[in-house]
């Protein structure tokens, strides 16, 4: 019989460190266990913390024996883990803002609860953020069921940064907006195979936004407003990650990192009530203010 799982306390967890991983979850015990297993296999970034915030309808996902074992494995390997519940639900943006408030780390990885990271991914992302000095870097998630679906038209949107990423103001209708198409299906995997980077090497490329696995400089994310726009949104929304990244891009720049070590589990979404795009609301307000 599995013994009760210690959730940890904010006082013990919220301390300065190099990196915290922030995971929102709801009704996904199996997927959360896989996501945590990917983190437990990371090396090269000692002592990173993990926050899991659960909004499940019933028992929290981290209470499932498989997920609980991965929590214990992370702690056994020297990683502080804070387990919380955030109810009632007020939408994705509020959940992200809450998670961000739990951290005092230099960098925060916003990781979805249905993403497995291959070994070496965290080291590559942390290195890239440090060397590039921008607001965020990310790994777009691969959909491996699409490996035989090659889409050359999407590949043309891949463009590398020649040096440090520069701030960009990206809006719908601009050519830059279509960069996101490189992240659909297995497009980035196909681009990576075509480029054939040497083992251990990585490249920074231009993005409009990245879903699922984004590493922010925490101070730069907060400087750009974080997810504080949540209070201006209805509960039923999506696209909060896009809204935050557009703001960070405009102030501090950002980049995708190739190769990506992030793999999408391709499970059905638990965000079924998403009538409003958060980025549309935020952008319309910024336009009105001008």
Regions found by a protein language model. Give the residues of each.
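Short aromatic/hydrophobic "clamp" motif used to bind/position activated sugar donors
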Residues: 108
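Acidic donor-binding segment of Leloir-type glycosyltransferases
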Residues: 38-84
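N-proximal low-complexity "stem/linker" segments adjacent to membrane-targeting elements
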Residues: 1-41
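The conserved acidic donor/metal-binding loop of glycosyltransferases
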Residues: 112-116
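Conserved donor NDP-sugar-binding/catalytic core segment of glycosyltransferases
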Residues: 120-180
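Glycine-rich, basic loop-to-helix element that forms the pyrophosphate-binding segment
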Residues: 86-103
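A recurrent flexible, glycine/aromatic-enriched loop bordering the glycosyltransferase active site
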Residues: 169-190, 196-216
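C-terminal catalytic/acceptor-binding lobe
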Residues: 2, 34, 196-197, 202-219, ...
């Amino acid at each position: 019989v599995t013994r009760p799982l210690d959730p940890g306390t904010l006082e013990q967890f919220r301390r300065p460190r190099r990196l915290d991983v922030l995971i929102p979850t709801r009704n996904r015990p199996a997927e959360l266990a896989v996501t945590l297993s990917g983190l437990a296999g990371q090396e090269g970034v000692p002592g990173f913390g993990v926050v899991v915030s659960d909004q499940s309808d019933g028992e929290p996902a981290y209470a499932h024996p498989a997920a609980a074992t991965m929590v214990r494995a992370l702690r056994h390997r020297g990683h502080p883990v804070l387990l919380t519940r955030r109810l009632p639900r007020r939408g994705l943006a509020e959940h992200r803002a809450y998670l961000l408030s739990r951290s005092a780390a230099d960098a925060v990885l916003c990781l979805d609860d249905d993403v497995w990271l291959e070994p070496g991914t965290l080291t590559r992302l942390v290195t890239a953020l440090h060397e590039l000095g921008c607001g965020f870097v990310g790994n777009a998630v691969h959909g491996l069921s699409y490996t035989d679906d090659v889409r050359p038209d999407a590949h043309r949107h891949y463009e590398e940064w020649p040096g440090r990423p520069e701030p960009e103001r990206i809006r719908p209708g601009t050519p830059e907006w279509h960069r996101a198409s490189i992240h659909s299906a297995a497009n980035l995997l196909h681009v990576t195979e075509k480029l054939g980077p040497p083992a251990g090497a990585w490249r920074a490329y231009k993005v409009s936004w990245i879903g699922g696995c984004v590493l922010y400089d925490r101070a730069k994310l907060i400087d750009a407003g974080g997810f504080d726009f949540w209070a201006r949104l209805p509960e039923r929304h999506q696209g909060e990650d896009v809204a935050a990244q557009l703001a960070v891009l405009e102030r501090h720049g950002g980049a995708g990192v190739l190769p990506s070590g992030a793999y999408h589990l391709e499970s059905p979404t638990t965000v079924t009530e998403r009538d409003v795009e958060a980025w549309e609301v935020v952008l319309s307000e910024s336009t009105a203010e001008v």
